[in-house]
Amino acid sequence: MVALGAVVLALDLPGGQLRWWYLAAIILSLAGDVFLMLPESAMDPELSFVAGLGSFLVAHALYVVGMVLLGVSGGWLVIGTVAAVLVIVTVGRRVIAGARATDRRLFAPVMAYVVVIAVMIATSFGTGIIVGIVGALLFGFSDSVIGWTRFLRDFPHS
């Protein structure tokens, strides 16, 4: 994440604000990684999970702001919205239900996170920028595997 932050600082990004939205998102993603890696002796595991989830949720919302600043095309946004709805219908709803069954207090944070990931996927398509689309889809896939493993059952080799 530190290397990604350095890349964002080094790139010649359009518009003056874009760099700072993305840098803030990367810093929050780093914080999310740290929260999720904390040993049980350092912090309660459920609190650590919610703090990590919250950090990533805000980071993804900042990525969405950055993508909107880049510009979003209606046609591509429709395609992205269809992709995002498919993610919610196929995986998201089951992960949300699993979170509720595991601990009712996790229902709202996990649901909010699934929605933000879906919005990020849709918005990435809206930019029409392939690297952004691939990045958002990889985030969505990775987080789907994590959610599935945590709340439903183990994924082989995950």
Identify the residue ranges that each predicted region occupies:
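Polytopic alpha-helical membrane-helix bundles and their juxtamembrane interface segments
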Residues: M1-S158
